[in-house]
Design a protein with these regions (language model features):
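Macromolecular interaction modules
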Residues: 1-153
Length: 153
């Protein structure tokens, strides 16, 4: 680790660089919720719910076969499910050196709200990823974000 340069880095420690290749599978529009009791500008609001998977590879598994399964089998499965339940963004990142990294990859799924994630879990079909993923060492983060845009006068 490096010495933190600011308070954010201090609280986000430990930080480590991670070289990945990103695949933007779905890049839909962020849902905007217009204001109802006053004029829409100079302020707009939007929000979303995001699920992030830091995916660990099972010991002894070939990362090339894993990435092939992820892109050619799992991605279509997730994309179809995301489209069916109203998800609007799906991004996959693969480690450039999975043999020396804690995680082989990362997946980010974006929904307008947490109910989209609930519907996703009810609809996703199992696929070949189960043969590669070390679920005990995979981490999952759930985040809600609200953004307020204020137009300068």
């Amino acid at each position: 680790g490096e010495v933190p340069a600011d308070s954010f880095q201090e609280r986000a420690a430990p930080y480590w660089p991670w070289a990945t290749r990103e695949y933007v599978i779905m890049d839909g529009a962020l849902p905007l919720n217009p204001l109802t009791l006053n004029p829409p500008f100079p302020c707009t609001r939007s929000g979303f719910f995001k699920v992030t998977f830091l995916v660990a590879l099972k010991a002894g598994k070939d990362s090339g076969e894993f990435f092939d399964c992820w892109l050619n089998e799992h991605v279509p499965n997730v994309r179809n499910t995301m489209e069916a339940v109203g998800g609007f963004r799906y991004v996959v990142s693969h480690s450039l050196d999975p043999s020396s990294e804690t995680y082989a990859g990362m997946a980010e799924l974006y929904f307008p709200d947490p109910s989209g994630w609930d519907r996703y879990r009810d609809h996703i079909e199992p696929d070949g990823m189960k043969n590669f993923v070390d679920y005990d060492n995979t981490d999952v983060f759930y985040t809600g974000t609200e953004m307020v845009g204020i137009e300068a006068p």
